[in-house]
A protein has these predicted regions:
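Short conserved micro-motifs on helix faces and helix-strand junctions that flank
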Residues: 27, 86-88, 176, 249, ...
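Residues in soluble alpha-helical coiled-coils and helical-bundle/repeat scaffolds
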Residues: 29-33, 116, 120, 187, ...
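Regular, well-ordered alpha-helical segments
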Residues: 44-47, 127, 161, 310, ...
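Generic structural signal for secondary-structure transition and capping sites
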Residues: 44-47, 108, 134, 164, ...
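Acceptor/aglycone-binding surface of glycosyltransferases and processive sugar-polymer synthases
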Residues: 73, 84-88, 92-102, 116-199, ...
Length: 337
């Protein structure tokens, strides 16, 4: 059930949401071909929600095309459009963080800027929020992407669900609505390597999924290369699981056990059977195999140590070089990580 404060947002006469301010956070990187359609559709959706106090926060993540120019022109005719231009390409998650730091609404929706997250789904999120949910996330029931990529996503989410220390919803990305309370907790987290969909789950509060169909890109190509997808997967794994470290200990203990068993067999063959164990080649293979395992898990440990090192430097997650339609306040300054 919605709280009394939330019930004041409803207007029974026209179905619009009154006294409620929604922020929409959108990272943008080289999306000049998509932005005009996105601005039109998102603007219409926010207008349908009423009041006119909503805001669209676009974060230009170091685009080299006309994305920033298009946003600047649009902001002159629509005061709801807020633009942050980062000093360089800091990455998708950092750009979202910049928008979340800027958001002033009672709730915030995070969505991608390629129209794969459909703006028309936002009213459904708002309706669930008004029913009392702090987090409303999109659960993707269909994806219009190559089958191999869909398979990788499918396997990744299920592997993360098994390996993570917290419950991560299956097939849910960054497309979600979060209450002001959840937003403030997220903004207080200083992580440099951010996996926002995992952080959103870690915060807790009342959460619910909404089935949505993930659309195809309106135009252009995905800005998420294989390298960036793998980096995001590693951020999720190493930020929310210590299973790799535990696996190193388990495999190490297993290797020691196998070695001891082989030693006992060798002693038995030598002292009881009066046989000399053969197999120099097999011994070399075994040594090489376990040396490879050792080096692999040394790399895993190094990954954790490297991330700790990144956190200790406390560099900003992002740097804003320009702001449009937003005033500078202490709250707007980038968080140190």
């Amino acid at each position: 059930m919605a709280s009394s404060a939330e019930l004041t947002y409803r207007n029974e006469n026209d179905g619009m949401v009154q006294g409620f301010r929604l922020s929409v956070a959108i990272p943008v990187h080289n999306e000049e071909s998509v932005l005009p359609e996105l601005l039109r559709r998102l603007g219409n959706v926010l207008t349908s929600l009423g009041d006119g106090k909503h805001e669209m926060i676009f974060v230009d993540d170091g685009s080299i095309d006309r994305s920033l120019e298009i946003l600047e022109v649009a902001s002159k005719s629509d005061p709801r459009i807020v633009v942050l231009a980062l000093s360089r390409n800091f990455g998708h998650q950092a750009a979202i963080s910049a928008a979340l730091d800027q958001a002033k609404g009672d709730a915030v929706v995070v969505m991608d800027g390629d129209l794969q997250d459909l703006p028309e789904e936002i009213p459904r999120f708002v309706e669930k929020h008004l029913q009392g949910f702090d987090v409303v996330y999109a659960k993707r029931i269909r994806r219009k992407e190559p089958w191999l990529l869909r398979l990788c996503y499918y396997l990744f989410y299920r592997a993360m669900s098994k390996l993570s220390d917290i419950r991560l919803p299956l097939d849910s990305g960054d497309f979600a609505l979060m209450s002001r309370t959840v937003l403030e907790h997220l903004n207080s987290m200083p992580e440099h390597h951010r996996y926002l969909r995992g952080m959103r789950s870690w915060v807790g509060f009342s959460q619910v999924g909404v089935d949505v169909e993930r659309g195809a890109r309106h135009s252009g190509k995905s800005k998420y290369s294989l390298k960036r997808l793998l980096a995001l997967a590693f951020d999720g794994l190493f930020a929310f699981s210590i299973v790799p470290i535990r696996a190193a200990a388990i495999i190490g203990a297993s290797a020691i056990s196998i070695s001891l068993l082989y030693l006992l067999y060798a002693l038995y063959a030598k002292l009881i059977l009066r046989e000399s164990p053969q197999g120099f080649t097999a011994l070399v293979v075994v040594i090489t195999f376990f040396s490879g395992i050792l080096l692999f898990f040394l790399g895993v440990i190094g990954e954790y140590v490297g991330r700790i090192y990144e956190e200790t430097k406390r560099r900003p997650q992002y740097i804003v070089r320009r702001k449009i339609n937003c005033a500078e306040t202490n709250e707007d300054r980038p968080k140190m990580s």
